[in-house]
A protein has these predicted regions:
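The feature marks the mature, well-folded catalytic cores of soluble enzymes
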Residues: 2-277, 283-333
Length: 333
């Protein structure tokens, strides 16, 4: 019997809510949001942000209210102004465009995404063809692809591996987007190794710790839940993967922006709901869902800590220097 099952036996006549931990903000998201908040407090408006700082509309709307201006391209930023790169990273082309416009850049790229960029440059310099496992239209993949576009191909499924054409099958390396499904990525890597026996990979896996931890937590409780709800925006890759993981194990699952997205029919005949959140979803949205479900009779709330998570990332030098120069400016998240 799992931990969740044993807990459920304590409240046989009460509908249960299993609140998964870890959930919500990862270290890279906390860092990125802190960077925007500190920049706004230290420098005032306007502060431009290229793309959504993280993939959550509530976070973006909150920062917009504080004065952040989100743009799709650095070409939209007036010359000489400050611009923050999102947590998903940018290509060298974007960096060069910023330089040409004399923009004052603050880089909020997640350090784990930067790691993938560094690996791409390294493999390309060593003469390898690169296979980037990920979703072609995701901001992170677009940025990584830009490091070595001439030698990089993107694949999103095992089936796509068969159609790859490479100049030298013995000089191949793969990298992955950081927010993918562990299981699907494992299948793609297996297909690559079968097709290209000499293929090389990163020294350590590219899928980030938070993506992995949240997927492991979902797997841990999926069999004990009648329904899984994932708080996260539709453009959040890691949030969508959590839904897919649950469904692959036979547990109905839905992605919700907030409690207003919950449909009453989902809760019919449901005794146990599991609740988690993607890595860019604020905790207050989770608590609003908890309150909503309590009103629907899910009053037995049990928080299950599947594993500890205490990762923190340092701030970029330009932000550290700002805090040092103005002690009143502090990290808020």
């Amino acid at each position: 019997m799992s931990e969740a099952s044993s807990l459920r036996t304590k409240s046989l006549h009460t509908k249960s809510l299993l609140l998964l931990k870890p959930r919500g903000f990862c270290a890279g998201v906390v860092r990125a949001i802190d960077i925007v908040r500190i920049a706004l407090e230290a420098f005032g408006r306007p502060i431009y942000v290229r793309k959504e700082i993280v993939h959550n509309r509530f976070v973006v709307e909150e920062l917009q209210q504080k004065g952040a201006i989100f743009v799709d391209s650095v070409d939209e930023v007036p010359e000489g102004e400050r611009v923050i790169y999102s947590a998903h990273g940018v290509s060298p082309e974007v960096r060069e465009a910023s330089k040409m416009r004399k923009l004052r850049v603050i880089d909020a790229t997640c350090p784990l995404v930067t790691k993938v960029h560094v690996e791409a440059v390294k493999f390309a310099k060593e003469g390898y063809s690169l296979i980037l496992i990920g979703h072609r239209d995701h901001d992170e993949v677009i940025g990584t692809l830009g490091e070595a576009p001439a030698v990089t191909q993107v694949v999103g499924s095992p089936a796509e591996v068969a159609s790859l054409t490479l100049p030298d099958p013995s000089r191949v390396a793969y990298l992955t987007q950081t927010t993918l499904s562990l299981d699907e990525t494992r299948d793609i890597i297996a297909a690559l190794k079968k097709r290209f026996p000499d293929i090389k990979g990163p020294a350590a896996q590219d899928i980030c710790y938070a993506t992995e931890n949240r997927q492991v937590a979902v797997k841990h409780v999926a069999s004990d839940a009648d329904l899984l709800l994932v708080v996260g925006s539709d453009n959040s890759s890691n949030s969508k993967r959590l839904v897919e993981v649950a469904r692959s194990l036979g547990t109905p699952a839905h992605l919700i922006d907030d409690c207003n997205n919950i449909q009453s029919r989902w809760l019919q005949d449901v005794k146990t709901v599991a609740l988690t959140a993607g890595a860019s979803a604020p905790e207050h949205l989770v608590q609003e869902v908890v309150e909503y479900l309590a009103r629907q009779g899910f009053g037995d709330v049990q928080e299950l800590e599947i594993m500890p998570e205490n990762v923190r990332f340092g701030l970029p030098p330009e932000i550290v220097e700002t805090i040092a120069a103005a002690p009143a400016v502090a990290v808020q998240s």
